Amino acid sequence: TVILKNGDELDGKTLWSDPTLDLAVVKVNAVNLPAAKLGNSEKLTVGETAIAVGTPLGLQFQHTVTSGIISALNRTVQIPTERGENFMEDLIQTDASINPGNSGGPLVNLKGEIVGINTVKVVSAEGIGFAIPIDVAKPIINHFIKQGKFTTPYIGVVGFDRQIASYYKQNKDIMAGVYVVNIDPKGPAYLAGIRIDDIITMVGDQPVN
């Protein structure tokens, strides 16, 4: 059920979801609905104002608005998923309050433009929350508008780049590419011959960096 600001309730249908990206597309059959403008997360700067909207801790606190700043950009966070441990990358870090239930709500700038989608917070600390940049969601949205569906690419590896490998004290001198730390034994990469400890430097003729 999708509940609008005026209290109207609409039936929602989940067209697509991906727990790894922590994103979903929900469709409602209605017309003339107001829509928020999508901003450009590439233009964000550290220190600018960020406003988070959501429903923390249940419906009794729906439409809660909190504010803060953009604390950092391009953060990487390790989270558990149904596929095992996953690394969410390129996240926006903010000190605007994000609590359970805020996930999926918008992070907006002072123009009211959506620049991110709230996702997770560090439970052991206050003032450290994260949002998915809206530019990550835009291709998915556009694909749905044009084709009515979206298939999540999946190769079945967990990889560290040079910076993350160094952070986790992996003794690998990686100058380029991605170091494979885990692999799905039923996934495409394994079937193609990729193994743990490999370094992927090219996919076809496309460099991996």
Task: Place the predicted regions along the sequence by residue.
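Serine-dependent protease modules
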Residues: 1-169, 174-176, 181-185
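Conserved PDZ fold ligand-binding element
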Residues: 189-209
